[in-house]
């Protein structure tokens, strides 16, 4: 899946770029294992995650239990698929990455259009280790497709009606 056909490499440091790209693979692996802890482990201790609906999670201590609840209930058995579009280094220890991806629900082979997203991630290297300091997930809404827009509108309305409150206990 690719939103843009003009994918390109944007760094001259192949080892660092490979490490940042691998971090994204680890993020997907944590999701696909259904492990909130593994999913959150790729973030810095105080990393930010902004979900597709605008909900913000601060730090692994919020990211892990929320995602575990998703993996145990609403997204049980789902898979996260994605592809890195580009990596750009702002400094030797900070990189911005864009990726496209989506959630594949059980019994499906690819994400439905309303589950496709573009993601912006900021990776930082601290003590020789790369981690994500920020993750912004935005659903792709190609306005030229009326059916996809209608599906998104309905899905968004249902999500808002039944969305998890961030203050929910994670029991």
Located regions from the model:
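Short, low-complexity N-terminal intrinsically disordered segments enriched in polar/charged residues
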Residues: 1-45, 153-171
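Short proline/glycine-enriched turn/loop segments at secondary-structure junctions
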Residues: 108-112
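Glycine-rich beta-strand-turn "strand-cap" elements at beta-sheet edges
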Residues: 2, 83-90, 138, 164-167
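Outer-membrane beta-barrel domain signature
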Residues: 43, 49, 106, 143-144, ...
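A mature extracytoplasmic/lumenal domain signature
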Residues: 100-101, 136
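Short beta-strand edge/turn micro-motifs at domain boundaries
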Residues: 1-2, 116-148
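Beta-strand elements of well-folded, non-transmembrane domains
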Residues: 103-107, 123
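A solvent-exposed, acidic/Ser-Thr-rich amphipathic alpha-helical stretch
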Residues: 17-18, 36-93, 100, 114
């Amino acid at each position: 899946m690719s939103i843009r056909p003009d994918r390109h490499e944007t760094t001259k440091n192949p080892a660092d770029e490979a490490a940042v790209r691998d971090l994204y693979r680890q993020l997907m692996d944590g999701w696909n294992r259904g492990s909130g802890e593994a999913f959150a482990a790729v973030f810095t201790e105080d990393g930010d995650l902004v979900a597709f609906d605008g909900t913000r999670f601060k730090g692994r201590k919020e990211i892990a239990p929320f995602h575990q609840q998703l993996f145990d209930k609403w997204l049980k058995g789902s898979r996260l698929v994605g592809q890195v579009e580009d990596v750009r280094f702002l400094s030797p220890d900070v990189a911005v990455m864009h990726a496209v991806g989506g959630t594949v629900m059980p019994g499906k082979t690819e994400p439905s259009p309303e589950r496709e997203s573009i993601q912006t991630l900021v990776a930082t290297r601290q003590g020789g280790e790369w981690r994500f300091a920020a993750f912004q997930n935005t659903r792709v809404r190609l306005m030229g497709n009326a059916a996809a827009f209608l599906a998104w509108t309905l899905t968004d309305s249902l999500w808002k009606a039944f969305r998890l409150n961030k203050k929910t206990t994670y029991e």
